[in-house]
């Protein structure tokens, strides 16, 4: 299972701290991040934790960018996804409501 994470600066800094201080396990993944914390990305890349880097619009996840976390099977097909808003995981109904209101601030932070 491959997991693609989408972070805002706040959550990414927490991941960096958890890895460096608590030595928590991070799977190989693609991290979407803001330019402003490229030093942290470089640090994690040097540890071999990050294998790919991309950018998002304004460093936030939106409906065009996809969900906050996507789970892939071995064939590369998405079989699960999670959305977050203000640090809280959203259920399927909440996502439908936000999309119907044309909300574009769904993010993991």
Cite the ranges covered by each PLM segment:
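Glycine/tyrosine- and acidic-biased, solvent-exposed loop/turn segments at the edges of beta-strands
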Residues: 3-6, 14, 18-109
């Amino acid at each position: 299972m491959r997991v693609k994470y989408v972070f805002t600066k706040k959550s990414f800094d927490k991941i960096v701290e958890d890895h460096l201080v608590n030595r928590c396990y991070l799977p190989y993944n693609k991290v979407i991040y803001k330019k402003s914390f490229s030093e942290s990305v470089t640090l994690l890349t040097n540890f071999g934790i990050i294998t790919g880097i991309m950018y998002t619009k304004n460093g936030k996840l939106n409906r065009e960018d996809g969900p906050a976390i996507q789970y892939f099977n071995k064939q590369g097909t998405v079989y699960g996804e999670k959305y977050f808003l203000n640090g809280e995981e959203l259920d399927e109904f909440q996502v439908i409501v936000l999309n119907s209101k044309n909300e574009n601030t769904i993010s993991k932070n």
